[in-house]
């Protein structure tokens, strides 16, 4: 099983990668040099004080690069209806928010991958059918991107055991998501515009705000005795 929970101290990575010329490499490490000879491309890659080294290989470059202040953000999340300029503005807001809450990101690049999003989705939003959009334009993409970005941000900066301390990563991420929604989407309902439908608005769930879902999910786990003991 691909557990992705290798635990190691921050290390210096020196990687020499040789692959067919047609392949593209995307990584949050520094690509120092690229040489092409007889159809073979050789890259020299380096990362200092890194907890992990992640490389994405493909015949086409699917990553969108956005420069935010001194940080280069690489993202291949599925595009939404949000315009590229608005995605850049939202991403700048996310990075600023994380800088204020967690501290400045210590590296030059960070990757937000679709694979990480699928492994750690925003439950509820990812289950909505494509024709149903109860939230404001860009909200779903913004929250999905923030969850993946904040998780990567934490995993790359906190030297915690990915398996034993998984609960701490999760707790910090939930805290950040609650604060982010409170700051930029106050009064957002858990059902979005569906809470105004006559068949729903009479029920208690229509009054619940987006962040109320976390306490409700915890109470459900506690009631079923499946919550993690401290």
Task: Pin down the residues of each PLM region.
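Juxtacatalytic substrate-recognition/specificity segment
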Residues: 15, 40, 44, 62-165, ...
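Acidic/polar loop patches that form or flank catalytic/metal-binding clefts of enzymes
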Residues: 24-28, 104-110, 161-163, 183-193
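Amphipathic alpha-helical surface "interface" segments used
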Residues: 35-37, 118-120, 197-201
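Short secondary-structure junctions and interdomain/linker hinges
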Residues: 22, 52, 101-105, 201, ...
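Extended, low-hydrophobicity, Ser/Thr/Pro/Gly-biased non-transmembrane segments
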Residues: 1-54
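Acidic/His/Gly-enriched intrinsically disordered linker/tail segments
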Residues: 164-230
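Active-site rim elements
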Residues: 2-5, 80-85, 163, 225-230
């Amino acid at each position: 099983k691909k557990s992705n929970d290798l635990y190691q101290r921050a290390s210096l990575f020196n990687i020499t990668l040789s692959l067919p010329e047609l392949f593209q490499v995307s990584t949050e490490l520094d690509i120092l040099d690229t040489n092409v000879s007889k159809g073979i491309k050789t890259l020299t890659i380096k990362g200092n004080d890194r907890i992990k080294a992640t490389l994405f290989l493909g015949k086409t470059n699917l990553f969108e690069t956005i420069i935010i202040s001194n940080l280069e953000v690489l993202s291949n999340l599925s595009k939404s209806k949000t315009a590229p300029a608005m995605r850049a503005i939202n991403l700048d807001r996310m990075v600023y928010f994380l800088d204020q809450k967690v501290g400045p990101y210590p590296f030059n690049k960070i990757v937000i991958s679709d694979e990480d999003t699928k492994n750690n989705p925003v439950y509820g939003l990812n289950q909505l059918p494509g024709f149903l959009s109860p939230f404001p334009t860009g909200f779903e993409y913004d929250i999905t991107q923030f969850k993946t970005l904040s998780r990567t941000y934490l995993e790359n900066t906190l030297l915690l055991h990915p398996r034993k301390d998984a609960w701490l990563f999760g707790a910090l991420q939930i805290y950040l998501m609650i604060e982010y929604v409170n700051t930029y989407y106050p009064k957002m309902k858990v059902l979005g515009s569906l809470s105004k439908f006559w068949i729903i608005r009479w029920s208690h769930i229509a009054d619940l705000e987006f962040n109320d879902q976390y306490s409700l999910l915890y109470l459900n786990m506690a009631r079923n005795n499946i919550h993690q003991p401290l």
